[in-house]
Structures are given as structure tokens and as C-alpha cells.
């Protein structure tokens, strides 16, 4: 991701954040941590586990809904986001919750925080969708202590291959190439997105001392609703994986 991509995404999210929070804010979990476009409970998926007493960094925290919930569960939570406007929403929610969440205004490709300073780095879509993984993954590895956890959700490469730009929908046929995927630029002034083939993700993790513990291909529960996807797309996601969650461990070998 070039600095121009980071600047473009910052400008886009400063413009989109009010609409995003109005559309999705009430859907995003406020009482317990939930993952992804269908808000599957963390208590069911058990990706992060017990965060009490841990230093936790959220990549692309938006209005900090996740970080607030983790702070309420005893984490020393830090939320990082590229959008100043998102932080206006975050500060309001943090004040309402009465918890301590530190906010850092920066892109996940260049985090102004010291090495080996976190037990957990995680992201629910956010910066692992809108940041270049060739820069965000090394940053996560740099920030983690040995044995630390790196976990994030994002769209599957399969879903990216089935996305139709003209209609802005997910099709039941392959319309984009799988091999070579990396940077996706669609509409002018909209955020740039990123993804990789699965093999490239695994090579990238290994290159930076991250061992894959699990890959969860999320299947929406029957009858699930979403403010992010249509009913037709939810049915698609019950047949094929639309989003997935990687859980990696820093090995201490780097």
C-alpha cells in the first residue's frame, strides 16, 4: 500500500464514517464481542479467549465498539484507526461506556508504537481489509510479544473472485481471477481494498514468524440477518465461505 493509498483511504473513511455508523452502529455488538458481517459471538468462536490483564491492539477500530467491550473484560485496550472522523464516534462511545481505551490515529501499515508491546493484535475486517497485508502483517508481528496472538477477519478470496463491480453484488460464478490478487480499486474516491490467495497469506505469516493455529470459515446461522449483506448474499454465504477468521501465534523465531 502506497502512502497515496493510505491518504485516499483516510479521506474516504472520513467522508463515509457518519453514514457507516448510522447504518451499522446499532448492528455491531454492544453487549458482547461479535465477529463479522453476521455478528457471530466471540463466545461461540473463541478466537481471542480471555483478554483480562492483556495489552490488546485493534487494527482499524472504527468507533471502538470491539475495544470498549474488551476493556470491559479487563483488557488494556488500544484502538488504532486511519480516520479522524471515526474517532469522533469512538470518543463518544468510550465516554458513554466509562472505560479506558487509548486511541491512536494512524494507518496499520506504519504504527507509531514500540516493538513487542502487545499480547494481542486483532482486527474485525477494518485495517486488514483496507491496508496492504505486505505491510500490515509485518507490523502486527513487530508489535506482538513472543507467544502473542494475531487474529483478523476479512472477506475470503473466493468472495473476492465472485464480486461483480458493475452491480456491487456477489455472484454465484467466478468473475475475477484468483491468482495474483492483491489490490482492488473500484469506484473513484472509494477505499482501496486488499486480499491475497490463501497460499500467499500462509507464506507471508511464516516469513514474519507467525504460525497459523486455525482458519475459521464463517457460516452465518440459519435465518441470520446483516446490515452489511442482502438476504440473497446471506444465502450465498451459507453455501460458500464469504468471510473467514485467521488466528496466528507469534513463534519468537524472529
Residue positions per predicted region:
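A short acidic, Gly/Pro-enriched loop at the edge of an enzyme's catalytic core
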Residues: 109-120
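A short glycine-rich, Lys/Arg-flanked "PGG" loop and its adjoining helix->strand segment in the class I
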Residues: 134-149
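Class I SAM-dependent methyltransferase SAM/SAH-binding core
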Residues: 55-110
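Conserved alpha-helix/loop element of class I SAM-dependent methyltransferases that forms part
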Residues: 26-54
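Short alpha-helix
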Residues: 192-215
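N-terminal, positively charged/glycine-rich alpha-helical extensions of SAM-dependent methyltransferases
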Residues: 1-27
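A short SAM/SAH-binding and catalytic strip from SAM-dependent methyltransferases
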Residues: 120-134
